[in-house]
Amino acid sequence: MPQLVPFYFVNEITFTFVIITLMVYILSKYILPRFVRLFLSRTFISKLSDISKK
């Protein structure tokens, strides 16, 4: 199993770091802002709805 051969440790650690860094960048730049905007718009709509019911 190549995962247990010490020769491959540096390679695995490097690619793991690259993949995690890439995923964090993609999530923070593209995916998460959409969810934040969606949440804020839903909150705003619910507050407007509450105001109109009074």
Swiss-Prot record:
It is a single-pass membrane protein. It is found in: Mitochondrion membrane. The keyword Transcription regulation does not apply. GO terms for molecular function: proton transmembrane transporter activity. Keywords: ATP synthesis, CF(0), Hydrogen ion transport, Ion transport, Membrane, Mitochondrion, Transmembrane, Transmembrane helix, Transport. Coiled coil: none annotated. The keyword Transmembrane helix applies. The chain crosses the membrane at residues 13-32. One of its GO terms (biological process) is proton motive force-driven ATP synthesis. GO terms for cellular component: mitochondrial membrane; proton-transporting ATP synthase complex. Mitochondrial membrane ATP synthase (F(1)F(0) ATP synthase or Complex V) produces ATP from ADP in the presence of a proton gradient across the membrane which is generated by electron transport complexes of the respiratory chain. F-type ATPases consist of two structural domains, F(1) - containing the extramembraneous catalytic core and F(0) - containing the membrane proton channel, linked together by a central stalk and a peripheral stalk. During catalysis, ATP synthesis in the catalytic domain of F(1) is coupled via a rotary mechanism of the central stalk subunits to proton translocation. F-type ATPases have 2 components, CF(1) - the catalytic core - and CF(0) - the membrane proton channel. Belongs to the ATPase protein 8 family. This is ATP synthase protein 8. It comes from Neurospora crassa (strain ATCC 24698 / 74-OR23-1A / CBS 708.71 / DSM 1257 / FGSC 987). The gene is atp-8.
